[in-house]
Amino acid sequence: MTAQVISGTELSKTIKSQVAQKIETYTQQGKRSPGLAVILVGADPASQVYVGSKRKSCAEIGIQSKSYDLPETTQESELLALIDELNADTTVDGILVQLPLPKHIDSTKVIERITPEKDVDGFHPYNVGRLCQRIPTLRACTPYGVMKLLETTGIDLHGKHAVIVGASNIVGRPMALELLLAGCTVTVTHRFTKDLAHHVRQADILVVAVGKPKFIPGDWIKAGAIVIDVGINRQEGKLVGDVEYDVALEKAGYITPVPGGVGPMTVAMLMFNTLSAYEMKIAS
């Protein structure tokens, strides 16, 4: 059995097109366009690529992107002052600070400084807390994108055993909350987990986000499982995921490719969240 490949590239185009249509409707009514402030501190090459794709998407769909490229030497106090300014700016609906930040800046303090209504990354404790209490507003982009990918399979998630490999604040933890909200029985594994293979083999839905190339052997995959590979790693000049794709492809029921799986969805959901933040503001 060869798995059906879930294309994030295709779904992300659909979502971005829907967002663009809504923005066009608002601007035709004489309303302003949504505004997204994107802050990059330093010159990390991967971060520059991610920020570039986010700004490009904004331009494509009609979101006004405001760019703040700050030097590596920027002080925490300067970054916090910029966030205060953007919080107060009525033309800015979303504020995104590209992570990771330089070592001398406390990312928790920075995330918490963004007003929750403009936290389009969905990382603020207030927004994570709302998801935890089953009343989500702005949801973390990658896990939210994964839920949209799972929807395309048409499979009822209620009662399915979902196993998450990796417990980061950005993917693993909010992913667990999303899957719980969808009615799954959720297991979260991490670096202290004993017998990882045992857990992975039981997964009806497997989400892997550890950032290690081919970390999960393909023969661990349960026959017919849905495999969501969040990892993007460079190996021998190629982009590969956290799952041994070729072997997993023969065992899974559905699988996301790398590249072209989860990556494009993260950006699409950022656009979706920016529109949501804008709509909440114009409604109030």
From Swiss-Prot:
Q: Name one GO biological process term.
A: purine nucleotide biosynthetic process
Give the EC number(s) listed in the UniProt record.
1.5.1.5, 3.5.4.9
Catalytic reaction(s) noted = (6R)-5,10-methylene-5,6,7,8-tetrahydrofolate + NADP(+) = (6R)-5,10-methenyltetrahydrofolate + NADPH; (6R)-5,10-methenyltetrahydrofolate + H2O = (6R)-10-formyltetrahydrofolate + H(+)
UniProt keywords, alphabetically: Amino-acid biosynthesis, Histidine biosynthesis, Hydrolase, Methionine biosynthesis, Multifunctional enzyme, NADP, One-carbon metabolism, Oxidoreductase, Purine biosynthesis
Pathway note: One-carbon metabolism; tetrahydrofolate interconversion
Q: Name one GO cellular component term.
A: cytosol
Q: Which GO terms describe its molecular function?
A: methenyltetrahydrofolate cyclohydrolase activity; methylenetetrahydrofolate dehydrogenase (NADP+) activity
Q: Where do the annotations place NADP(+) binding?
A: 166-168, 232
The record, for InterPro entries, names: Aminoacid_DH-like_N_sf, NAD(P)-bd_dom_sf, THF_DH/CycHdrlase, THF_DH/CycHdrlase_cat_dom, THF_DH/CycHdrlase_CS, THF_DH/CycHdrlase_NAD-bd_dom
Q: Which SUPFAM superfamilies match?
A: Aminoacid dehydrogenase-like, N-terminal domain, NAD(P)-binding Rossmann-fold domains
What does this protein's UniProt record list under function?
A: Catalyzes the oxidation of 5,10-methylenetetrahydrofolate to 5,10-methenyltetrahydrofolate and then the hydrolysis of 5,10-methenyltetrahydrofolate to 10-formyltetrahydrofolate.
- Summarize subunit and interaction data from the UniProt record for this chain: Homodimer.
* The name this protein goes by in its record: Bifunctional protein FolD
* Record organism: Pasteurella multocida (strain Pm70)
